[in-house]
Amino acid sequence: GLFNQNNSSLARFSFGNQQMVRDYFKAVNRRGLGDTANDMAIYGSKIYVIVNISSTVEVIDFRTGSSLKQIQMLAENGSSRQPRYIAFHKKKAYVCSYDGTVARIDTTSLSIEAITSVGRNPDGICVQNEKLYISNSGGLDYSSGLGVDNTVSVVDIATFKESSKLTVGPNPGKIVAGPDETVYVATRGEDVEAGDYNFVKIDCRTNKVTQSNEKVQNFAIDGEIAYLYNYNYNTQTSSIKMFNLKTEETIRENFITDGTVIKTPYGININPYSNNVYITEARDYTTYGDLLCFNQQGQLMFRLNNIGLNPNTIAFSDKASQSDIDDNDDDKENPLAFANKVWEYRPAPGQFINTTTSAYKEGFTYDDILEEATRRIQQK
């Protein structure tokens, strides 16, 4: 959604029938999500959506799409905590908020059990080795004399108290648990648009912090492989690379191999069931963006157009939801959209049209690919 416009949405795409409901939450619950949905995750039988400006955690029944509870993230004086991101561990949810706190929520009762203080304006959270790692951005202090923060707070889960702060670099944001007891964080510099980004590794056994020369604004990790993306505000161009975390070497400078162009990458997630890479396109930040799915070879498999404003997070499940809603035709993606995509984009040899099969065969012409793709989709 757009900041202060109260127009966040949740889209649902079903791999079974290849249909999308663009505003799924509203269709089921007859109300919107709120203002600036910032993060989302599936844990157990529930979906958790962090709605930043509304200062809520929306808890949704995965099977039906119905809202179970809207948890108000408010301070004792009634002010908004402005939640940002969520992580889970042993039936507890941990939510970091811009007011410098982390809340512990019981995933059964959906009640806030405790609050602990960390650094300034936390903007990311993950779990590793029975500890929480929270990136303290200090982003709201950018224009003040105080400046941005440059630390990651380490919170012992058992005591729910901060045990240490690690200096990682100015304005840390995305933070993810990696292999071999590591945590990785992207630092964004004093001024995000200046491009002073860095990719930082934390060894959780020793708390050693290692800087790299990788320019990273956002990233996702799949085992030992990281997908790193960067956006240059001066040239308004983006780049996405594959990086081996173990060898600390670039696997492929350009992850996308088939010529697909993403103007404004806004989010990146890995499907744990297929290892496909999903990247969202925000376009100009004010019009509906898209979701693109790539295989590990960097080939576009499909694209969902106009899924919502500033799409930022994708969550996956190997189970189908069973909601009774039947959204109108305007809000559904017809399966033929995948075949029609061939008219707009000439695929490279081996281009995948959907998640299971390739429409390309040796010697196929452009028209042959379209015909074969349509035939296979109609058989589904």
Predicted regions and their residues:
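Predominantly soluble domains enriched in secretory-pathway, periplasmic, or organellar proteins
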Residues: 1-331, 338, 342-345
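A detector of low-complexity, intrinsically disordered, Ser/Thr/Gly/Pro/Ala-rich segments
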Residues: 95, 105, 353-355, 372
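Intrinsically disordered, low-complexity segments enriched in small/polar and acidic residues
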Residues: 326, 337-339, 343-344, 354-359, ...
